[in-house]
């Protein structure tokens, strides 16, 4: 009997142990088990927010046992969080207790740098250059009066510029003295603005040289850099029965304080006092309209005209005692009636039921990834980023991020914490557009005065001999520039020609993709991962356009509430576009399909005339040509506006240089068996609209068309000769006349001589007169050959009938050369038949 009792006890103990083990094994390998049995991700343990209802994931005992992996830094303290080792002593506090910035040695500048009194390092050429580059101004303290060398011109402001820039029709001194008549005499005939007024009849010519819409002249909002569009304007006066808005416009007096803004600056609704409102926890609105204090309700004194403050049945009754009044979560008893409330993270649906709020529906809830939980949410980061414990923002891990920006005569480089600030490419004329290729460590820029696009290795950029001219002709105003880092192409806009063009990064092959009369394309950004490009256009009407990187499927993405769109950038991981509007003084964002539009920031002072912007982590950076400065702000909320650099000279484009901004992708033009995708000229990525979309299409230079095989190129004269019967051809816009001959590569393994369009056309013209005479010679010979071939086939057929054989069908060998190049059967390269010529002959020769 005693043995049976012991056996029963052992069995019960074993069952309990197995049950406990089963509970412990409920969670996966990468999960943490709360004390109540709930499983959460190990990434959420000791991150400052309790996911376990019992708080065991944030307890001191749990966090003490956390060990940081190699390369990480332990914050220590009660929470003991782990951060990236690269965040240690980076000038930004990441641990709650600030331990990551304790005991850090002062930053040391290199031998070829100047150290400001505040510890910032700048290039020595910035010292005593009349610009405050140190935030404390120490780089301009105790400077002697500057004297210019023999090869320089000294401006009236003592600034020195190269002598070649003086009297060239383009002001380079900050006071414009290099173009004053007393120095130059008559205007220089070869200046960039040979026409005294390059603006159209519908535009206003600013004194500083820009062209703006005529409707912006005298609208009480300066748009010119020198504010000349608001000079000598008549002052508007309003009638006695009108209200004058802060911008000077007049509206009828009855529209003031009507709860609907009628002034553009909303000044008609400022300072209004609404006496009819009855809101707040201590107010009660009678059914007869009066507003009384809540302490007068159910006090046996009738204060409302209709006695609605003293209902006999409701006063003194607590409806929450009966099944919580039907509320699913919280019932709050009121003096009259009751109300259902919801805990944080839930919302009331109807009058009684609470439902979880999906915070992740808002794209700005988290900086990158959002995980919705019951009653809460969790933010996570993309690969290459880690969640910062203090701010809950995603911070990049790895290389140092730099801002590259144009400063009229140079390109400068600056770290995000402003600890390093140097000149990257000096001695330029008028650099406007800028972009980089991180993998090759190369930078590209356009010069508005030289009307060229250049490139250089970033490490060797200061040496002028290392510059490469990528595009050196047929440019008028290359205002925007973008690099396709996957397919090694560059895209640029030309606001005077109204074009968007593409070329390989060597500049050997180029093509005009888009041209429209009246358009003024400005900034451009590319998404080579998905095959799209986006650009701003401040023509009439102003809009933001989207199209494929091969020039197809172009349409307007933003057409409303947009006036002067300038810079544009893409948050590739978040799938959102950001742009600045110089007329609306705003930064806005929208998803890549045109939805979920949001205004990030509106500020007439900090966004007086924004020109370009860049995005990284949770920050947006922008240049402003009127403030002559660079600012930053939180890209989700528009808060935390900071001054990054000031006292600049016409800062225009800005890009962020970091390896995470240009993720790797597949270059399908190089994945096929044929070189360059089998294309004779350009192989361009196609937009990935759906899973069946082509990976690329072939393109020909301006003035040439695709042949029937959709790979070879024909001149327009040849296509007219070889076309049989009527055909429908969708023409692409032809850009400016090229003087250089386009380089045509071979399709498949056929060697073709490289020749210009004129050579191809002239060859076709010289061969055409002798073709009729050749028919009299070739035709009889061809008939004899056909007769002999037919006789051979008859003999072979008779011979095969007398031979026994077994045949095996092999579908691989049944595939003909025609099948290989047929556009509908190719697994990689396709085209859009409705947009291409399909009636041309294959035989070009």
Swiss-Prot record:
GO terms for cellular component: apical part of cell; basolateral plasma membrane; caveola; cell surface; clathrin-coated pit; early endosome; external side of plasma membrane; Golgi apparatus
Name of encoding gene: LDLR
Transmembrane segments: 775-795
LDL-receptor class B repeats: 441-487, 488-530, 531-574, 575-619, 620-660
Cell compartment(s), UniProt: Cell membrane; Membrane, Clathrin-coated pit; Golgi apparatus; Early endosome
Organism of provenance: Bos taurus (Bovine)
Keyword terms of this UniProt record: Cell membrane, Cholesterol metabolism, Coated pit, Disulfide bond, EGF-like domain, Endocytosis, Endosome, Glycoprotein, Golgi apparatus, LDL, Lipid metabolism, Lipid transport, Lysosome, Membrane, Receptor, Repeat, Signal, Steroid metabolism, Sterol metabolism, Transmembrane, Transmembrane helix, Transport, Ubl conjugation
Gene3D superfamilies noted in UniProt: EGF-type module, Laminin, Low-density Lipoprotein Receptor, TolB, C-terminal domain
Pfam families cross-referenced by the UniProt entry: EGF_CA, FXa_inhibition, Ldl_recept_a, Ldl_recept_b
An annotated Gene Ontology molecular function: low-density lipoprotein particle receptor activity
Protein name as it appears in the record: Low-density lipoprotein receptor
Start-end of Polar residues biased regions: 717-733, 742-757
Family: Belongs to the LDLR family.
Motif (NPXY motif): 808-813
Disulfide bridges in this chain: 27-39, 34-52, 46-63, 68-82, 75-95, 89-104, 109-121, 116-134, 128-143, 148-160, 155-173, 167-184, 199-211, 206-224, 218-233, 238-250, 245-263, 257-272, 278-291, 286-304, 298-315, 320-331, 327-340, 342-354, 360-370, 366-379
Protein topology in the membrane: Single-pass type I membrane protein
Cytoplasmic topology ranges: 796-845
């Amino acid at each position: 009997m005693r043995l049976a009792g012991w056996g029963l006890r052992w069995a019960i103990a074993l069952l309990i142990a197995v049950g406990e083990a089963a509970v412990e094994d409920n969670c996966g390998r990468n999960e943490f088990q709360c004390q109540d049995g709930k499983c959460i991700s190990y990434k959420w343990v000791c991150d400052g927010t309790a996911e376990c209802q019992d708080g065991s994931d944030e307890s001191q005992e749990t966090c003490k046992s956390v060990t940081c992996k190699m390369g990480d830094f332990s914050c220590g303290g009660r929470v003991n969080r782990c951060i990236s080792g690269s965040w240690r002593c980076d000038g930004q506090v990441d641990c709650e207790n600030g331990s990551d910035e304790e005991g850090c040695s002062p930053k040391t500048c290199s031998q070829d740098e100047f150290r400001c009194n505040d510890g910032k390092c700048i290039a020595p050429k910035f010292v005593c250059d009349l610009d405050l580059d140190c935030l404390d101004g120490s780089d301009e303290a105790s400077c002697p009066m500057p004297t210019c060398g023999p090869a320089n011109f000294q401006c009236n402001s003592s600034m020195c510029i190269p002598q070649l820039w003086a009297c060239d029709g383009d002001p380079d001194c900050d006071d414009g003295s290099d173009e004053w008549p007393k120095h130059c005499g008559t205007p220089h005939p070869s200046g960039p603005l040979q026409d005294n007024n390059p603006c159209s009849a519908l535009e206003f010519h600013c004194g500083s040289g820009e062209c703006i819409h005529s409707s912006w002249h005298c609208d009480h909002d300066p748009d010119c850099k020198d504010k000349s569009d608001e000079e000598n304007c008549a002052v508007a006066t309003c009638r006695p029965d009108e209200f004058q808005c802060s911008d000077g416009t007049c509206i009828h007096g009855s529209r003031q304080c009507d709860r609907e803004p009628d002034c553009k600056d909303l000044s008609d609704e400022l300072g209004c006092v609404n006496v009819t409102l009855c809101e707040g926890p201590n107010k009660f609105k009678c059914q007869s309209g009066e507003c009384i204090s809540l302490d007068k309700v159910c006090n046996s004194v009738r204060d409302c005209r209709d006695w609605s403050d003293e209902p006999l049945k409701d006063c003194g009754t607590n409806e929450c005692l009966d099944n919580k009044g039907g509320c699913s979560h919280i019932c709050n008893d009121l003096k009259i009636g009751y109300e259902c409330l919801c805990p944080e993270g839930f919302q009331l649906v109807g009058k009684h039921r609470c439902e979880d709020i999906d915070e992740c529906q808002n794209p700005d809830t988290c900086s990158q990834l959002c995980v919705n939980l019951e009653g809460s949410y969790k933010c996570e980061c993309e690969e290459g980023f880690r969640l910062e414990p203090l701010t809950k923002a995603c911070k990049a891990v790895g290389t140092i991020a730099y801002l590259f920006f144009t400063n009229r005569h140079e390109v400068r480089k600056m770290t995000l914490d402003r600890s390093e600030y140097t000149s990257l490419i000096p001695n330029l004329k008028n650099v406007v557009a800028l972009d980089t290729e991180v993998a090759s460590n190369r930078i590209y820029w356009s010069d508005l005065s030289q009307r060229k696009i250049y490139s250089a290795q970033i490490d060797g950029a200061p040496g002028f001999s290392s510059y490469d001219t990528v595009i050196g002709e047929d440019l008028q105003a290359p205002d925007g520039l973008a690099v396709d880092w996957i397919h090694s192409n560059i895209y640029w806009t030309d606001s005077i020609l109204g074009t968007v063009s593409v070329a390989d990064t060597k500049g050997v092959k180029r093509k005009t993709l888009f041209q429209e009369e009246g358009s003024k394309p400005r900034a451009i950004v590319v998404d080579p991962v998905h095959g799209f490009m986006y650009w701003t256009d401040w023509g009439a009407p102003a809009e933001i356009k989207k199209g494929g990187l091969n020039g197809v499927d172009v349409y307007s993405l933003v057409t409303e509430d947009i006036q002067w769109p300038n810079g544009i950038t893409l948050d590739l991981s978040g799938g959102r576009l950001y742009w600045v509007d110089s007329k609306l003084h705003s930064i806005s964002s929208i998803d890549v399909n045109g939805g979920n539009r949001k205004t990030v920031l509106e500020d007439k002072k900090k966004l007086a005339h924004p020109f370009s912007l860049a995005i990284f982590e949770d920050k947006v950076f922008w240049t402003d040509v009127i403030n002559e400065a660079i600012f930053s702000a939180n890209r989700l909320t528009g808060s935390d506006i900071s001054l990054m650099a000031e006292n600049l000279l016409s800062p225009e484009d800005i890009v962020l240089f970091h390896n995470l901004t240009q993720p790797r992708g597949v270059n399908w033009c190089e994945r096929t068996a044929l070189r360059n995708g089998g294309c004779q000229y350009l192989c361009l990525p196609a937009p990935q609209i759906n899973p069946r979309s082509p990976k690329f299409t072939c393109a020909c230079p301006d003035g040439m068309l695709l042949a029937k095989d959709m790979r070879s190129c024909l001149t327009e004269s040849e296509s007219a000769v070889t076309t049989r019967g009527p055909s429908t051809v969708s023409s692409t816009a032809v850009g400016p006349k090229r003087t250089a001959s386009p380089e045509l590569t071979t399709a498949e393994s056929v060697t073709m001589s490289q020749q210009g369009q004129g050579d191809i056309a002239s060859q076709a013209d010289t061969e055409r007169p002798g073709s009729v005479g050749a028919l009299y010679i070739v035709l009889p010979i061809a008939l004899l050959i056909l007769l002999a071939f037919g006789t051979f086939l008859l003999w072979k057929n008779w011979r095969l009938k007398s031979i026994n054989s077994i045949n095996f069908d092999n579908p691989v060998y049944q595939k003909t050369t025609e099948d290989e190049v047929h556009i509908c059967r190719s697994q990689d390269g396709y085209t859009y038949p409705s947009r291409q010529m399909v009636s041309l002959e294959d035989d070009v020769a």
